[in-house]
Amino acid sequence: MESDRETIHLQHRHSMRGGNQRIDLNFYATKKSVAESMLDVALFMSNAMRLKSVLQQGPFAEYYTTLVTLIIVSLLLQVVISLLLVFIAILNLNEVENQRHLNKLNNAATILVFITVVINIFITAFGAHHAASMAARTSSNPI
């Protein structure tokens, strides 16, 4: 190791005459984290609307407790994932001393995303999306 702030050099297949071309892995990781955060915001908004729909139906709706619990757990996981992605974006991947910590954070975020996907599959299976259409059809307000 040359120094504590050593940067990683990668060789492109189609590199120019200079041979090695410097790639800023930190910039790549930051862009990836921002893109994941945008997807997380979209899912968060969708789950918030599902929660609103289920709550409007009331506690006598089918699977009410199950859906409310799953949606709240999903929302909480999404907040934790967002915080992890912010920390991943803040830390510099090019600094060797951060790489091990960033790898652990990235693994944790990936596991939490997988769990969130599974929870959202169950939310869809229990019919939270039907709750909105049922509430709209049974509403006494004219369209």
From Swiss-Prot:
Its main location: membrane. Residues 94-97 are cytoplasmic. Residues 39-58 are annotated as: Helix alpha2. Induction: By nerve injury; in Schwann cells. GO terms for biological process: cell adhesion; tissue regeneration. Keywords: Cell adhesion, Cell membrane, Membrane, Transmembrane, Transmembrane helix. It is a multi-pass membrane protein. One of its GO terms (molecular function) is cholesterol binding. The keyword Transmembrane helix applies. Homooligomer; in response to stimuli, homooligomerizes into filaments. In contrast to NINJ1, the filament is curved toward the intracellular space, preventing its circularization on a relatively flat membrane to mediate plasma membrane rupture: curvature is caused by cholesterol-binding at the cytoplasmic leaflet. Its role in unclear. In contrast to NINJ1 paralog, does not mediate plasma membrane rupture (cytolysis) downstream of necroptotic and pyroptotic programmed cell death. While it is able to oligomerize and form filaments, filaments are curved toward the intracellular space, preventing circularization to mediate plasma membrane rupture. May act as a homophilic transmembrane adhesion molecule involved in nerve regeneration. Promotes axonal growth. Composed of 4 alpha helices: 2 hydrophobic transmembrane regions (alpha3 and alpha4) and 2 alpha helices (alpha1 and alpha2). Alpha1 and alpha2 feature one hydrophobic side and a hydrophilic side. In contrast to NINJ1, does not disrupt membrane integrity. NINJ2 filaments are curved toward the intracellular space due to cholesterol-binding, preventing circularization and ability to mediate plasma membrane rupture. Belongs to the ninjurin family. This is Ninjurin-2.
